[in-house]
């Protein structure tokens, strides 16, 4: 597992010995991630139109300082290799966008998550927030890899 970046701009990646289709199936099973990922309390697909998905997620984790934070995301899927998402609306989030990519490599796939997040927080909390979100990203990538292996 690799995590690069700081201050809300990150690239996390992990190699998983599964097919791209299997990895994609786990990654896009949005509602099943609630309670499995350390920060996703609830997840609901609000609408789907072709490759566009509208998703409502509730986050609760150390980086939310104990609060449940709701976010509505638009996801553009390009199966089985790429997913782009961006914030439509959210509580205490100024900006949230990212790209998931699945790239075949020898012995499996490289799963990469590029993320940009700007919370709506007092500036004195930002350092703590970024430390906590980095820990969460590491945990999330490891759990995602485990879910892909279980399939």
Model-derived regions: residue spans:
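Hydrophobic ligand-binding cavity/cleft-lining segments
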Residues: 1-48, 139
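A generic structural signal for beta-strand entry/edge sites
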Residues: 7-9, 50-52, 80-82, 106-110
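Short, surface-exposed coil-to-beta transition loops
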Residues: 9-11, 67-72, 94-99
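Preference for bulky hydrophobic residues occupying beta-strand positions
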Residues: 12-14, 57, 85, 113-115
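Beta-strand elements of well-folded, non-transmembrane domains
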Residues: 16-20, 59-63, 77-79, 89-91, ...
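Hydrophobic pocket/interface hotspot
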Residues: 22-26, 33, 75, 111-113, ...
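Glycine-rich portal/gate segments that line the openings of hydrophobic small-molecule binding cavities
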Residues: 44-91, 142-151
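Beta-strand/loop substructures that line and gate deep hydrophobic ligand-binding cavities in soluble
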Residues: 87-135, 139
């Amino acid at each position: 597992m690799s995590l690069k970046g700081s201050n809300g701009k990150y690239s996390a990646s992990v190699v998983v010995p599964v097919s791209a289709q299997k990895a994609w199936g786990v990654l896009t099973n949005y509602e099943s991630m609630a309670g499995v990922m350390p920060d996703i309390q609830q997840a609901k697909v609000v609408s789907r139109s072709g490759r566009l998905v509208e998703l409502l997620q509730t986050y609760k984790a150390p980086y939310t300082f104990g609060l449940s934070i709701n976010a509505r995301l638009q996801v553009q899927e390009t199966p089985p290799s790429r997913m782009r998402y961006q914030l439509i609306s959210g509580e205490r989030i100024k900006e949230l966008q990212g790209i998931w990519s699945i790239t075949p490599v020898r012995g499996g796939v490289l799963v990469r998550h590029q993320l940009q997040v700007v919370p709506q927080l007092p500036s004195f909390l930002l350092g703590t927030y970024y430390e906590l979100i980095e820990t969460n990203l590491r945990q999330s990538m490891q759990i995602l890899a485990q879910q892909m292996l279980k399939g």
